[in-house]
Amino acid sequence: MSSVDVLLTVGKLDASLALLTTQDHHVIEFPTVLLPENVKAGSIIKMQVSQNLEEEKKQRNHFKSIQAKILEKYGTHKPESPVLKIVNVTQTSCVLAWDPLKLGSAKLKSLILYRKGIRSMVIPNPFKVTTTKISGLSVDTPYEFQLKLITTSGTLWSEKVILRTHKMTDMSGITVCLGPLDPLKEISDLQISQCLSHIGARPLQRHVAIDTTHFVCNDLDNEESNEELIRAKHNNIPIVRPEWVRACEVEKRIVGVRGFYLDADQSILKNYTFPPVNEEELSYSKENEPVAEVADENKMPEDTTDVEQVASPNDNESNPSEAKEQGEKSGHETAPVSPVEDPLHASTALENETTIETVNPSVRSLKSEPVGTPNIEENKADSSAEAVVEEPNEAVAESSPNEEATGQKSEDTDTHSNEQADNGFVQTEEVAENNITTESAGENNEPADDAAMEFGRPEAEIETPEVNESIEDANEPAEDSNEPVEDSNKPVKDSNKPVEDSNKPVEDSNKPVEDSNKPVEDANEPVEDTSEPVEDAGEPVQETNEFTTDIASPRHQEEDIELEAEPKDATESVAVEPSNEDVKPEEKGSEAEDDINNVSKEAASGESTTHQKTEASASLESSAVTEEQETTEAEVNTDDVLSTKEAKKNTGNSNSNKKKNKKNKKKGKKK
C-alpha cells in the first residue's frame, strides 16, 4: 500500500469551504469540516493520501452478491400462465378450478374468466379463491372457458377448456351432502348411498363444498346449530328429502326438487319409498359365482358315466374278462344310484320317470334295468328277463303322453342300446357259462353277473317299438278329429246353392218388360195419322198442329206409363214367389221355365188389350184435338185485341189486318 505526503497552506477559510495552496501555487478547495481544529488562514497543513486494497476487495464482493440476488429474483422466476381444470359438470352448471397463481416478481392486476370468447366475470381474490361455480347453463350444450391473467410483466392466457352439460338422464354430476336424518322414518345412510350408486352419482359427502348440488336431510330440530345446513342455505343449495334420490332412481332421470322440499306436500313421498337394504343383497352377486362352479362340477361325473356306458360294449367283444372287471367297477359305482332291487317295482319306477323330463338318460337306463339276485342259472335268468320286459312294456302302455318328450331325449340312448342288444345275444351264453363257473366264488362275483346283465340288454329292442306305436296311436285321433271339420263345411256350400237359383227367375222376369214396350210404340202410330188431314188445311194451321202435338205428347206418355206398370206388376209377383219357397234345386229349374211361359202368355194377352186401348186412345185424341183448336181460336181473339191497339197507331195497316182476321175466322169456322 503506497502513500503520498503533501504540505498545504490555508489561504482562505470559510464556514464550509477552505482554499488551500500548494507549493507549486495550485489552489485546492477542501471542506473545512475535515480540517483540524484551531486552523486559521496562513496555517500549514500536512496531508497523507494512501490506497486501501483490502477494503476494495470487500466492497467488490459485496456488490457482486447484490447483483446475483437481483438476477435471481427478477430474471429466473417469470410469471406462469394459469392452469384451468373441470371439477364437476351437471345439467345447468359447472365447477371450474385452477392451480395457485405464480407471478414471480410481477404484480397481479386482474384475473378474468372468458366464456366462448366473451368476458364472463372477474374473479375476486384470485390468490385465496381457486374455484368458481358457473350456473344458468343450457342442458346438453357445449361450452368453452378460458382464464386471462393480467400482471405487471404482461398478459397471460390459460388453455381453453371445452365441456358439455349433461342430459336429463345423465346423473353422474349429482353430488349429495348428507345432513341429519330422522331415525323414526327408517331411512339409513346405506339406502341413500346404494341409490346414488345405482344412478351413477358421485359418492356421498359429509361436508358442503362448492361442487355440492343437493343437501339431503329430513330432520330440522337443530337447524341453528347445524353448520353444514347453514352453509348450504348460504350457497343456495337445494335442501331436499331423501326420497328425491329414490325418485331419480325410479324415474331414471333427474327429477325436479319442487315436490321434495322439507315444507312441501308429503303425498308424493309415498310413491318413492326406499327398499330395505340387507347385507345378503350386497353379497348376492358374489354368491352366485361359486354356486355356478359347484353345479358344473356336479355335472362332470354324469357326463363321464355316459361315456363309459357307450364305450363298454365294444370292449366286451374283444376281452370278456376285462368286461367282468369293468362290470364289477360299474356295479359298485351304480349301486347307490339305483334305488330299486326287485323287478316288480321297476314298472312303478318307470311311471315316475315319465313325469320328470329332466332325468339323465344314464340314470333312466339304470333304473329301468332290475338288479338280479346272485347265482342265477340260465333258465331263471331268461325267465326273469322276460318278466321284466313285459312289466316295463305295460308301464309304457299306461304312461301319459308326456313320454313323447322323454322319448325324444332317449333317442341317443336307444341307439347305444341297439348296439348293445346286438352284442348282448352273443354275450348271454358266455355270461351264463361264466355264472356257472363263478358260483363257488361267492358274493364277490355278484356285481360281475349284474354288470353282464346290464351290458347285454335285450330290453331295449322291445321297449322302443312300443313307444313308437304309442306315439303313432296318439297321432291317429288327431287325424280323425280333422274329418268332422271338413264335413261341417259341406252344408255351408249347399246353403249357397238356393241363393244362386233364386236369382235366376229375377233375370227372366226382365224379358216380358222388354216385350211390353212394343205395344207402346204401336200406340204412337195413330197420333201420326191424325196429323195428316191437318197438314192439308193450310200453312197457319200447320203451326198450331205442331204445337198441339207437342202438348199431347205428355198425355200419351202418362197412358204409356200406366200400360207399362201393369205387366211389370205381374212379372214382379212371378219373380218374388219362387224365392220365398223352399224348393229343391232340380225342381226350381222346371218351375222357372213354367213361369217364363206364363209370363209370355200374359204378355200376348196384354198385346191384345193394348190394341183395344189404342183405339180408345185414338178417339180420345181426336176429341182432344178439337179442344185444342178451340183454344187456338181464343188465342186468335187475343191477337185481334192487340191488333186493334196497333191500328190506332198505324191507321194505314188496320184495314189489311182486319181482312186477314176475317179470313182466319172463316177458316176456323169451317174447321
From Swiss-Prot:
Residues recorded with modification Phosphothreonine: 305
GO molecular function: protein dimerization activity; small GTPase binding
SUPFAM superfamilies: BRCT domain, Fibronectin type III
Topology term for the membrane: Peripheral membrane protein
Compositionally biased spans, kind Acidic residues: 461-486, 522-538, 627-638
Location of region: Disordered: 280-671
More info: Present with 172 molecules/cell in log phase SD medium.
Biological role: Component of the CHS5/6 complex which mediates export of specific cargo proteins, including chitin synthase CHS3. Also involved in targeting FUS1 to sites of polarized growth.
Record note on quaternary structure: Component of the CHS5/6 complex composed of the 4 CHAPS proteins BCH1, BCH2, BUD7, and CHS6 as well as at least CHS5 and GTP-bound ARF1. The complex interacts with the cargo protein CHS3.
Record protein name field: Chitin biosynthesis protein CHS5
Species whose genome carries this gene: Saccharomyces cerevisiae (strain ATCC 204508 / S288c)
Gene from which this protein is expressed: CHS5
